Amino acid sequence: MMKSRFCPSPTGLMHLGNARTALFNYLFAKSKDGIFLLRIEDTDVERSKETFDLGLQEDLRWLNLEWQEGPGADEGNGPYHQSKRQAIYDDYYQRLEEADQAYPCFCSEEQLRLSRKIQRSAGKPPRYAGTCRSLSAAEIEKKKAEGLQPALRFRVPDDEVVVFADLVRGEQRFQTNDIGDFIIRRANGTSPFMFCNAIDDALMGVSHVLRGEDHLTNTPRQLLILQALELPVPTYAHIALIVGPDGSPLSKRHGSRGIKELRDNGYLPLALTNYLARLGHYYASDELLSLAELAKGFNVESLSKSPVKFNAQQLDYWQKQTVNQLPNDDFWEWAGSELQSQIPTDKADLFLTTVKPNVSFPRDVAYWVNVCFGKTLNLETAQSELLRATGNRYFEEAFEAFKKFGKDLNSVVSHLKEKLNLKGKPLYQPLRIALTGAEHGPELAKLILIMDYETIQNRLQEACQ
């Protein structure tokens, strides 16, 4: 059975980049009636935190990316935290050493740094120089007796080519002579990503690895490990990374935020999944799609090879589409029961139908609740100046028109047009700003029907001051 996976490191909060990777793996699995697996890669003992681990899982559940295998689900191939799998890795280290496919390396970080510097100055790509590759058993024991703790390096075969078919990028070829022997166990005994990631994919039955293109150069190394251990090899697909509008790595200065921050600010999960699913993947439909619909239209061959640019406005577009399609009960659960309680029952339906198409976040709902039912508006300086420039007569005539015609906006506007000889923006804008504090928004005629007559009178009088 097809099985994809998402394997984050709990060293920080989930950001848009790894949320997108998780989503693509989820959609890929669902499109093939496969299994979506979650594995926590927490071998970085110093930086891994349980709070981040739980936060990552919470974010995935909030996005409705439920895993069928992993922590809290089917744990048949577990444990799914790499920190609990060291004995498994140790067994494979022993197999490699016994087959002379791995060897101890006693080089210090300073020695390695100097070696890389010399290679770069000679115009060569930095790779391990093989200093410890041919140490005899006696030399190894002597160094250990001196108290030196070795790392373990994989012995990369000379003069070979590692070839694999990437589902996104086509055939990939890597010369082993350019790779160099690499570390598969640190000197402190812990396992780096390169090794345990490959081992776990094989042992957990992962058939497809869909990950960022920054892992592309890891793949030949992991293939060499799996082939040496005669373990099954997954199919790989390396997706383009998200970058900022200027083409540089995505960061907060581009408007990127973590999933928790987006959630706390009122973004909805379906808005994020619709935006991220289209970030480097083509969908024929430009409608808001459910996760099932996104999965049905997902095709790994439709993934872009080029970096994809983050666009905060596009994310907000999908947020607005999602809010507009929320059932009423879900809308108020999202906006908050406190806001709902401020709306008179007899005006709740009209308020919702009037305001809903014009809001994207709970703070927007709060604004229009205050417009319709609050006592004061906080005008911006430019708005106050516009009202002063309009002159008191406009608002005095508007006051009288509302007294005469009630909440019939068409009659009020006709009265102003006749009395003041106005048309266009000078006719409509001062009235909208005086009553709502905004230059744009929901249909003014409907807002007026929601407002108390006293509120309308008070705001027109305030505009005269």
Curated annotation (Swiss-Prot):
Domain of life: Bacteria
Class of enzymatic activity (EC top level): ligase
Listed SUPFAM superfamilies: An anticodon-binding domain of class I aminoacyl-tRNA synthetases (SSF48163), Nucleotidylyl transferase (SSF52374)
Motif 'KMSKS' region: where in chain: 249-253
Principal subcellular localization: cytoplasm
Annotated ATP binding sites: 252
EC number: 6.1.1.17
Key words, A-Z: Aminoacyl-tRNA synthetase, ATP-binding, Cytoplasm, Ligase, Nucleotide-binding, Protein biosynthesis
Record localization: Cytoplasm
Motif segment ('HIGH' region): 8-18
GO function terms (MF aspect): ATP binding; glutamate-tRNA ligase activity; tRNA binding; zinc ion binding
Catalysed reactions, as listed in the record: tRNA(Glu) + L-glutamate + ATP = L-glutamyl-tRNA(Glu) + AMP + diphosphate
Record note on quaternary structure: Monomer.
Assigned protein family: Belongs to the class-I aminoacyl-tRNA synthetase family. Glutamate--tRNA ligase type 1 subfamily.
Purpose of the protein: Catalyzes the attachment of glutamate to tRNA(Glu) in a two-step reaction: glutamate is first activated by ATP to form Glu-AMP and then transferred to the acceptor end of tRNA(Glu).
Protein's UniProt name: Glutamate--tRNA ligase 2
Organism, as annotated: Coxiella burnetii (strain CbuK_Q154)
Lineage of producing organism: Bacteria, Pseudomonadati, Pseudomonadota, Gammaproteobacteria, Legionellales
Gene that this polypeptide is encoded by: gltX2
